[in-house]
Amino acid sequence: MQAGLRIDVDTYRGTREGVPRLLESLDEAGVKATFFFSVGPDNMGRHLWRLIRPQFLWKMLRSNAAGLYGWDILLAGTAWPGKPIGRDLGHLMRQTLAAGHEVGLHAWDHHGWQANTGRWSQAQLIEQIRRGVDSLNDILGQAVSCSASAGWRADERVIEAKQQFGFRYNSDCRGQSLFLPRLADGSLGAPQIPVDLPTFDEVVGPVVAAKDFNSYILDRFSPDKLNVYTVHAEVEGILMANDFRQLLASARQRDIHFQPLGNMLPADLASLPAGKVVRGALEGREGWLGVQGA
């Protein structure tokens, strides 16, 4: 059974500590994945202001966020400028590419993207993407060929903004199948590879206990589904690193074969159906996010 493995790297600590452990676990399992890196300032601690929203507060409490992520992640960029991830830790991004993994852009400023996507102008959206692309291009020494919107914060405006960067594909939304998003002028944009499986933080607590998560998620892979799974360097690369190593071993026993997302594209892109990315909601995730629409 084929499956896509996507690894989101949101923070400075996730890059510095989580990525090396994930690379080690993946090498041990003989698995290649797609890493989406945040490359600008780590301002993730500014999400603490969202605690005034009941849904976000409940998510932080049920997932034991302080224990899961660590206070350095939860406070990053609050009382001091966020550390520059790409400038300080670009060598780990190059190491990821050299290890044979696919590398794409997650965001310039992960917090900024999640907090402001819905109100930024088209010019501001394009500038944020450009800063991230230029930075990651310089770090890798080659052009970035794919991207994934931070927090799945994407809609039709975001899809339009990304089109000018010539990405081979994007993974900006939640959905059930690969598709070509329809643009404002009626043409079709770069392929979308949605995520169709829940993440650890979306279900642990209200749905399943952390100790039972591996079995829970592996039971949801199916030959007749897309099977795109997302892990986070801040979770599966740090506190849950051993559990992720066990998940990779269990997946192999179940004949689940992970691969980079780019490998899931068909040879003939014209064979993909048309669709669109629209705003929607998802149980376990606070606020709006991009979902696959008809």
From Swiss-Prot:
Protein's pathway: Glycolipid biosynthesis; 4-amino-4-deoxy-alpha-L-arabinose undecaprenyl phosphate biosynthesis; 4-amino-4-deoxy-alpha-L-arabinose undecaprenyl phosphate from UDP-4-deoxy-4-formamido-beta-L-arabinose and undecaprenyl phosphate: step 2/2; Bacterial outer membrane biogenesis; lipopolysaccharide biosynthesis
GO molecular function, one term: hydrolase activity, acting on carbon-nitrogen (but not peptide) bonds, in linear amides
Keyword Hydrolase among record annotations: yes
Assigned GO CC terms: membrane
EC number: 3.5.1.n3
Top-level taxon of the source organism: Bacteria
Entries under PROSITE patterns matching the protein: NODB
Catalytic function, reaction form: 4-deoxy-4-formamido-alpha-L-arabinopyranosyl di-trans,octa-cis-undecaprenyl phosphate + H2O = 4-amino-4-deoxy-alpha-L-arabinopyranosyl di-trans,octa-cis-undecaprenyl phosphate + formate
Pfam families: Polysacc_deac_1
Keywords, in A-Z order: Antibiotic resistance, Hydrolase, Lipid A biosynthesis, Lipid biosynthesis, Lipid metabolism, Lipopolysaccharide biosynthesis
Classification via InterPro entries: ArnD, Glyco_hydro/deAcase_b/a-brl, NODB_dom, Polysacc_deacetylase_ArnD
Record bears the keyword DNA-binding: no
Domain NodB homology: 1-259
GO biological process: 4-amino-4-deoxy-alpha-L-arabinopyranosyl undecaprenyl phosphate biosynthetic process; lipid A biosynthetic process; lipopolysaccharide biosynthetic process; response to antibiotic
Family recorded in the similarity comment: Belongs to the polysaccharide deacetylase family. ArnD deformylase subfamily.
Function: Catalyzes the deformylation of 4-deoxy-4-formamido-L-arabinose-phosphoundecaprenol to 4-amino-4-deoxy-L-arabinose-phosphoundecaprenol. The modified arabinose is attached to lipid A and is required for resistance to polymyxin and cationic antimicrobial peptides.
Full protein name: Probable 4-deoxy-4-formamido-L-arabinose-phosphoundecaprenol deformylase ArnD
